[in-house]
Amino acid sequence: MAYGILLLLLGGLLLANICMGSVTIPLEGIFRFIKGEALSQVETNILFQIRLPRALSAAILGGALGLSGYLLQTFFHNPIAGPFVLGISSGAKLTVALVMVFLLGQAVKVSSAALILSAFFGAFLSMGFVLLMAKAVDKMSMLIVSGVMIGYICSAITDFVVTFAEDSDIVNLHGWSQGSFSGMSWSNVQVAAIVVGIAA
């Protein structure tokens, strides 16, 4: 029953995301399109080039984020374990900040894949430190404390690194840390679906 309600909510949110925007696509127009009737060229472009890729990316990656949190809580037997509490997110942001400030600052071209790999490396490294600290005291209850400590250390180093950054790099880092689904394409949806499918 609960899963059915969640699926209905997800479907409703997807429809709202598709219909609402600077150009409104009426809900009846979506249903007519499903039945085989054609939309206008503008509505078709907005639907298939902008809103559908964005909505599907949000659904796939949002589900992956929820699943990762559930797996962390299950693995560590702690209901409050998560990427923010364990310092994983802070470690990822630190390495991305280093790449943006010191590589982009030197006019080195950095691809999205490089930022993703650097974030993964930082998350993996910070999680390793947390596990080592928790193992040293031999108490899983110290895992959360260790994660919070690592998170604050990474955040402090990130703030220090940002002081050397150009204004444009600070804006880029802030935009990356906040996250956005604008500009998502069908190729991004395919990559996200493949990666999440393999990881799951």
Show where each model-derived region lies.
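Alpha-helical transmembrane segments in inner-membrane proteins
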Residues: 1-200
